[in-house]
UniProtKB/Swiss-Prot annotation:
Residues annotated as site: Important for catalytic activity: 224
Enzyme class of the recorded protein, top EC level: hydrolase
One of the protein's GO biological processes: hypoxanthine salvage
Protein name per its UniProtKB record: Adenine deaminase
First and last residue of the signal peptide: none
Entry-linked HAMAP family: Adenine_deaminase
Binding positions for Zn(2+) per the UniProt entry: 20, 22, 200, 281
Native source organism of the sequence: Cupriavidus necator (strain ATCC 17699 / DSM 428 / KCTC 22496 / NCIMB 10442 / H16 / Stanier 337) (Ralstonia eutropha)
Cofactor note as given: Binds 1 zinc ion per subunit.
Function: Catalyzes the hydrolytic deamination of adenine to hypoxanthine. Plays an important role in the purine salvage pathway and in nitrogen catabolism.
Family note: Belongs to the metallo-dependent hydrolases superfamily. Adenosine and AMP deaminases family. Adenine deaminase type 2 subfamily.
């Protein structure tokens, strides 16, 4: 399926919010090598090209293995700052106006990096991005679900001195053998602290994990959630309760959640009234930032301009933003889509 050139231009230019991106997953091979050299960290790859070739993982666990290896070069506030600014520049180029960014402190504290170094490095970059690029953002601290809940509790408590620098908690890493109920108590504690709650569920795990994330963890938003399509009653509930799913199509294909983007349930769930939003996940590893995900999805599925408008609106509707700022972004989206798309200039025929 070939996307209309005018629509392709519109989806590239529409204002968007990115609600599902792991900052460690934006580490491009070039930056990994640069930081490794700066910090004198030995890498098991002789070149940038060899590292990029290693990105040919086959499932979530093999991806996570290389993901954690790449993160080993992050040691100082400057490293976290540089990684974050690299992401911001790419996001701004894709017309991302607001981002709610995941970070995994346990990946770094396990290596002896203080949690303050992690949070301050990322948050300082985002503060500069707000001034330099008018880029709105917030941080969501994620717990690694393959580790014990006690580790999550310790991470949350260690992060409390930096409470003003993040807005919520999430749950990521391998779903298999790590159901939502494993983290019920730490999510209850986060809720007591007034933090927003999100959770990865229904990616490699079953639809029941989506239900459990809602009912046990009290998640306000579900990350991935595509396996909900296997449970029609759950799809109806998601639509009725306006629970947003932060869907990452290129990630789902790369990790073999679906064999082909044409098999992805995004369009079916959108048509069923679910608040679907479209994001990049770990773009350095999955071969696509926001616009690449949007373009590939529109090329693979029977989506039109009305769907694009809805997806852009949904991304801001689902964001943890103050009401006035959210209304301003939604007005910006609606104004953008109220104008008829302009076709790109035609290329002059060869003489």
């Amino acid at each position: 399926m070939t996307i209309d050139a005018a629509l392709a231009e519109q989806i590239r230019r529409t204002p968007k919010a990115e609600l599902h991106v792991h900052i460690e997953g934006t580490l491009e091979p070039e930056l990994i090598f640069r930081l490794a050299q700066r910090n004198q960290v030995a890498l098991p790859y002789p070149s940038v090209e060899a590292l990029r070739a290693a990105y040919a993982f086959t499932d979530l666990q093999s991806f996570l293995d290389i993901y954690y290896a790449g993160a080993s070069v992050l040691l100082t506030e400057e490293d976290f700052f540089d990684m974050t600014m690299d992401y911001v520049k790419r996001a701004v180029a894709d017309n991302v106006r607001h981002a709610e960014i995941f970070f995994d402190p346990q990946t770094h504290t396990a290596r002896g990096v203080p949690i303050g170094v992690v949070i301050d490095g990322i948050a300082d970059a985002l503060a500069q991005a707000r001034t330099e690029y008018d880029f709105s953002s917030s941080l969501i601290l994620c717990f690694l679900r393959h580790l014990p809940e006690e580790d999550a509790f310790a991470t949350l408590e260690a992060a409390l001195p930096y409470r003003d620098r993040f807005v919520g908690v999430g749950l990521d890493s391998s779903e298999r053998g790590n159901p939502p109920e494993k983290f019920a108590r730490v999510f209850a504690r986060a809720r007591e602290l007034g933090l927003h709650l999100v959770a990865h569920a229904g990616e490699e795990g079953p639809a029941q994990y989506v239900t459990d994330a809602l009912d046990i963890l009290k998640a306000q938003r579900i990350d991935h959630g595509v396996r909900a399509i296997d449970d029609p009653a759950l799809v109806e509930r998601l639509a009725r309760e306006r629970v947003a799913l932060t869907v990452c199509p290129l990630s789902n294909v790369k990790l073999k959640v679906y064999p082909d983007l044409r098999d992805h349930p995004l369009k079916r769930m959108l048509d069923a009234g679910v608040v679907i939003t479209l994001h990049s996940d770990d773009p350095a590893y999955f071969g696509g930032y926001m616009n690449a995900n949007w373009e590939a999805t529109f090329e693979a599925l029977p989506l039109d301009a009305a769907d694009a408008h809805k997806l852009a609106r949904n991304s801001f509707e689902a964001a943890f933003l103050p009401a006035m700022q959210k209304a301003e972004f939604l007005a910006e989206v609606d104004h953008f889509w109220s104008s008829p798309p302009k076709s790109p200039p035609a290329t002059a025929p060869a003489a």
